Design a protein with these regions (language model features):
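Active-site-proximal alpha-helix that buttresses catalytic centers in soluble enzyme cores
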Residues: 1-137
């Protein structure tokens, strides 16, 4: 994410602190297309797979994304609940509990590194709420 400076910062607007609770991420559903999209985002990160990009691109797009999403979708379906992905459901519950303990000037949000809620959008939301300090967990 690129730094975006404030052209006209309003010092009269009360500053807030943001608490960003982060987790790795999860597909939006256990459907094959959502699992494929999640795996592509996750496995395209050069910090996750550290081999030359050209070689990895072929392996990822030519092999892994053709076969793995279907197998992984079945595994995701086996742990999925009526509420959704366990990782997302429990992460949201943690955020709600932490939010309830915080004073009014502290914003608590959840972001996933891969998938949704997206890290960049969540950070921009905190910025829009005038959060000038950020605690990342």
């Amino acid at each position: 994410m690129k730094y975006v400076g404030e052209q006209e910062f309003d010092h009269k607007n009360p500053q807030r602190t943001g608490v960003l609770i982060c987790n790795l991420g999860t597909p939006e559903s256990y459907k094959v297309k959502d699992v494929r999209s999640f795996l592509k985002e996750f496995l395209s990160d050069g910090r996750v797979i550290e081999i030359p990009k050209a070689i990895w691109w072929f392996i990822l797009n030519g092999i892994i994304l053709r076969f793995r999403p279907k197998k992984s979708a079945k595994l995701y379906e086996s742990v999925w609940t009526e509420e959704g992905s366990p990782l997302l459901v429990y992460s949201q519950k943690i955020v709600e509990k932490v939010r309830a303990l915080m004073p009014e000037n502290i914003e608590v949000e959840l972001a996933m590194r891969y998938g949704k809620p997206e890290m960049e959008k969540t950070l921009l939301s905190l910025k829009d709420k005038n959060c000038r300090n950020l605690i990342v967990l």
